[in-house]
Swiss-Prot record:
Its EC number is 4.1.99.1. PANTHER family: BETA-ELIMINATING LYASE-LIKE PROTEIN-RELATED, TRYPTOPHANASE. It holds the Pfam family Beta_elim_lyase. This is Tryptophanase. Pathway: Amino-acid degradation; L-tryptophan degradation via pyruvate pathway; indole and pyruvate from L-tryptophan: step 1/1. Homotetramer. Gene3D superfamilies: Aspartate Aminotransferase, domain 1, Type I PLP-dependent aspartate aminotransferase-like (Major domain). The keyword ATP-binding does not apply. Belongs to the beta-eliminating lyase family. It comes from Escherichia coli O9:H4 (strain HS). The keyword Electron transport does not apply. The gene is tnaA. Keywords: Acetylation, Lyase, Pyridoxal phosphate, Tryptophan catabolism.
């Protein structure tokens, strides 16, 4: 098997969900009704759903079996302690708060860290800035809701789809330290390390880069939060690309990675493979005060701290999923599936970001050069792909990035990308071939695809619920 060209799916399919086929006319009507926003399509009208890998994949038999052990006690559930034990064993973090998903963790820790910086360091809320290699959209949104400006400090290779680089998700370390000095260290409430960097194309961050980032953070006494949705994929890339760790296990690399943060926030719906769940964890007693404050907010916003909006069975499933998501054979297959899709698209001259961990990212700016950024070329491409083949994908570009909350002007985006997100253990190689063929048809009509403008624009996280029309 070692020398075969393609890895088959390393699992057997036991339960299937039928999907319906629709006509072009049906899909054209559906996308117009949705306001040219694939988020607002009904799932039953989607043939292949590449909107997200968040909670949309299959679960393992061990995860499904674990649900039967669920303790549904309101407080002190043994299922909570099973989850907390998994966190200690995998990440080395002592304090665990479950949440319903990643944004549940964000809405808790962000105001707590801002308040802590204000009380201990005299943070000026009118000047505060948080830094990241690239903020995930909800992390950015929660920061802005709390009055915190966000700044992404990424390397120059990150968004250049013509460049191949092992760790495109890395922090620009000089830019990070320069930015901290500019705003004043006391006005930086937190640094977020996003692994992998979703907005850059599911690109990994090296351990060397994380170490250096953490050293800078410690120099200025700034807390570091690891945004951990795709921690296992990041560990796999480190094993493959960072020579020092080629003989380490995924578990060993993961444990080493989390030495270089103080807290973790996780949407467990990605690499932990669960349909619902999140985590907020603190490494040790130095953040016990933060843990205490976050537990209090959890009661108000998520639920009692030993369930955090999750039923007992869901916590048991997550406790197992954290391990199952680190399986080396599984990760090798998953990364290879994404690479297969990217290779197939590039063979038909569809320019992509180099293959990342969870999705193929098409360079819509190059495919549709006639559509300006403020008419959202990747969103227009998403709508066309749905019309042609019933495939739902998601824009990662100017539409998602949004406006400057202070000036109201569109923020400049480094690339206009269309994300084709692969749900875990859900689609086969035949589906990948169908997606590639769909892009052949899209390319034939590319010159006739029109840009988009708003008919309804929310002020925060607009890409989820906005409505548009063709220009």
């Amino acid at each position: 098997m070692e020398n075969f060209k393609h890895l088959p799916e390393p699992f057997r399919i036991r339960v299937i969900e039928p999907v319906k086929r629709t006509t072009r006319a049906y899909r054209e009507e559906a996308i117009i009704k949705s306001g040219m926003n694939p988020f607002l399509l009904d799932s039953e009208d989607v043939f292949i759903d590449l909107l997200t890998d968040s909670g949309t994949g299959a679960v393992t038999q061990s995860m499904q079996a674990a649900m039967m052990r669920g303790d549904e006690a309101y407080s002190g559930s043994r299922s909570y302690y099973a989850l907390a034990e998994s966190v200690k064993n995998i990440f080395g973090y002592q304090y665990t708060i479950p949440t319903h998903q990643g944004r549940g963790a964000e809405q808790i820790y962000i105001p707590v860290l801002i308040k802590k910086r204000e009380q201990e360091k005299g943070l000026d809320r009118s000047k505060m800035v948080a830094f990241s290699n690239y903020f995930f959209d909800t992390t950015q949104g929660h920061s802005q809701i709390n009055g915190c400006t966000v700044r992404n400090v990424y390397i120059k290779e990150a968004f250049d789809t013509g460049v191949r680089y092992d760790f495109k998700g890395n922090f620009d370390l000089e830019g990070l330290e320069r930015g901290i000095e500019e705003v004043g260290p006391n006005n930086v409430p937190y640094i977020v390390a996003t692994i992998t960097s979703n907005s850059a194309g599911g690109q990994p961050v090296s351990l060397a880069n994380l170490k250096a980032m953490y050293s800078i953070a410690k120099k200025y006494d700034i807390p570091v939060v690891m945004d951990s949705a795709r921690f296992a994929e990041n560990a796999y890339f480190i094993k493959q690309r960072e020579a020092e760790y080629k003989d380490w296990t995924i578990e060993q690399i993961t444990r080493e990675t989390y030495k270089y943060a103080d807290m973790l926030a996780m949407s467990a719906k990605k690499d932990a493979m669960v349909p619902m769940g999140g985590l907020l964890c603190m490494k040790d007693d130095s953040f016990f005060d933060v843990y205490t404050e976050c537990r209090t907010l959890c009661v108000v916003q998520e639920g009692f701290p030993t369930y955090g909006g999750l039923e007992g069975g869901a916590m048991e499933r997550l406790a197992v999923g954290l391990y199952d998501g680190m399986n080396l054979d599984w990760l090798a297959y998953r990364i290879a599936q994404v690479q297969y899709l990217v290779d197939g698209l590039e063979e038909i001259d569809v320019v992509c970001q180099q293959a990342g961990g969870h999705a193929a990212f098409v360079d819509a700016g190059k495919l549709l050069p006639h559509i300006p950024a403020d008419q959202f070329p990747a969103q227009a491409l998403a709508c066309e792909l749905y019309k042609v083949a019933g495939i739902r994908a998601v824009e990662i570009g100017s539409f998602l990035l949004g406006r400057d909350p202070k000036t109201g002007k569109q923020l400049p985006c480094p690339a206009e990308l269309l994300r084709l997100t692969i749900p875990r253990a859900t689609y086969t190689q035949t589906h990948m071939d169908f997606i590639i063929e769909a892009f052949k048809h899209v390319k034939e009509n590319a010159a006739n695809i029109k840009g988009l403008t708003f008919t309804y624009e929310p002020k925060v996280l607009r890409h989820f619920t906005a409505k548009l029309k063709e220009v």
